[in-house]
């Protein structure tokens, strides 16, 4: 694993710890924390936010494609995907899951044809 991958995993793990600390059950204050407010509103509010961020990601990608996939428009894709990942991590935390659970699932699928993996889900 490269240093870049390790630091990326570290960032995700640290963020997961912060998200966990923002849960109202762990002392997160909805009046002082955006994440605590999302947790206090429940999973429908989190899911709505993920839907919004997914749409913004799609729109940023379309804008980047129209701009030749370079420059500031391409940078907006990264910005929107970061928002999408962040809110997906809030959802994971809401269900007691971590980024490591997702990474482990991706590792399980590594080297497996997408069509083969999809067929296995039907079993």
From Swiss-Prot:
Its EC number is 3.6.1.31. It is found in: Cytoplasm. It comes from the Bacteria. One of its GO terms (biological process) is L-histidine biosynthetic process. One of its GO terms (molecular function) is phosphoribosyl-ATP diphosphatase activity. It catalyses: 1-(5-phospho-beta-D-ribosyl)-ATP + H2O = 1-(5-phospho-beta-D-ribosyl)-5'-AMP + diphosphate + H(+). Pathway: Amino-acid biosynthesis; L-histidine biosynthesis; L-histidine from 5-phospho-alpha-D-ribose 1-diphosphate: step 2/9. The keyword Cytoplasm applies. Keywords: Amino-acid biosynthesis, ATP-binding, Cytoplasm, Histidine biosynthesis, Hydrolase, Nucleotide-binding. GO terms for cellular component: cytoplasm. PANTHER family: HISTIDINE BIOSYNTHESIS BIFUNCTIONAL PROTEIN (PTHR42945), HISTIDINE BIOSYNTHESIS BIFUNCTIONAL PROTEIN HISIE (PTHR42945:SF9). Belongs to the PRA-PH family. This is Phosphoribosyl-ATP pyrophosphatase.
């Amino acid at each position: 694993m490269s240093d870049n991958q390790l630091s990326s995993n570290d960032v995700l793990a640290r963020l997961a710890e912060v998200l966990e600390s923002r849960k109202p059950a762990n002392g997160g204050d909805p009046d002082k924390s955006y994440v605590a407010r999302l947790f206090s509103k429940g999973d429908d509010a989190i899911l709505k936010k993920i839907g919004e961020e997914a749409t913004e990601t799609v729109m940023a990608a379309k804008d980047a494609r129209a701009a030749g996939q370079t420059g500031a428009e391409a940078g907006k894709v990264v910005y929107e995907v970061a928002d999408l990942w962040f809110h997906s991590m809030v959802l994971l935390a809401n269900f007691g899951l971590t980024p490591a659970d997702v990474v482990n699932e991706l590792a399980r699928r590594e080297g497996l044809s997408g069509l083969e993996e999809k067929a296995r889900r039907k079993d």
